[in-house]
Amino acid sequence: MVASSTPPNPGPVTAGDRTVTGGRTLMLVLATVGFALNFWAWALLSPLAPRFRDELGLNSFQESLVVAVPVIVGSLGRIPIGALADRYGGRLMFPVVSLITVLPVLFLGLVGHSALAALLIGGFFLGIGGTVFAVGVPFVSAWFPPEKQGLAIGVYGMGMGGTAISALTTVRLVDAGNTATPFLLCAVALLIYASVAWYLLRDAPGRTPPTESVTARLNQTVRLPATWAASALYAVSFGGFVAFSVYLPSYLRTAYDLSQTDAANRMAGFVLLAVVMRPVGGWLADRFDAPTVLAATLCAVVIAASVQATTPDLAPIGTLAFLVLAAALGAGSGATFALVALIAPAGKVGAVTGFVGAAGGLGGFVP
């Protein structure tokens, strides 16, 4: 008697299965929106830095400091916030971080833009918005099975496009209204999001909060080989993205004598491609394996950067090199956190994410 080769019927999809899937999708959407809105707030000062320089008579160092303070605070702040996310869950931390971020946004919009000291104080607390990244990675990864975590975290990572919202709208909103306009709109959006998140967000079923103190878990996390390996990878991939998004317009104007508008448009295209490629990198890590994807993306970065180091003609070689860099850095960022979700110990995904996210943010300052 020949055994049938037909695989067993897994049975019909139940209402419970659909409910779980729908719940995962809703949680992913809410987390991504929260990430984008907080990153919008985090990036509000950068587009206005030249205006502050002219209005307040700032020198180049002071102008750079206004931009750098929220970036540094947001990067380093991911370390404790990630540990707190492990302890209290995204259901609490997303609305809390969003509500806290509203305060410096309102301060800067209403009174904090009239003096350098006020800008630096407001920028310091505005950095809290940049810590939200460390909340979402453990939250999202807990909702999805291992074979889908890479894609899910990659989709969540598209929330970094919130910086593009700021870049594209802040100056226009100031010109259409006044300095307070973009800050007030962002504050309203964060308040609405915090309210919606409080009522709709739910931590994944079966989540078990760690019992150790935050300090103890941070000490344990810093000793994990996975923390340092993923931090180095993210410092290159996301740090490279940050560096290019900051310095690319100046480089294009200097090396190729482009107009400010043309350089800004090319930078926007670079950022957009990197953002789109982030979930692709996560999906590829699910499909194959994260180390293989990371090795391929890093090789692509080395080749494209080596080509661009010779300052070739912008059309077509230079443009192609920048496109490869954007795609590889975006995919590498997505694959890195697919790796984190797999190798970080249960209960420490947020803490590891905090360290890795800090390394990525600070990696952008290397140039």
Summary of predicted features, one role per range:
Residues 155-201:
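Helix-loop-helix hairpin linking two adjacent transmembrane segments in secondary transporters
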Residues 11-21, 204-231:
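Juxtamembrane intracellular "pre-TM" segments in multi-pass secondary transporters
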Residues 346-367:
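A late C-terminal transmembrane helix in Major Facilitator Superfamily
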Residues 45-49, 226-276:
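Extracytoplasmic gate region of multi-pass secondary transporters
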Residues 76-114:
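Conserved MFS/SLC helix-loop-helix module at the cytosolic interface between two early adjacent transmembrane helices
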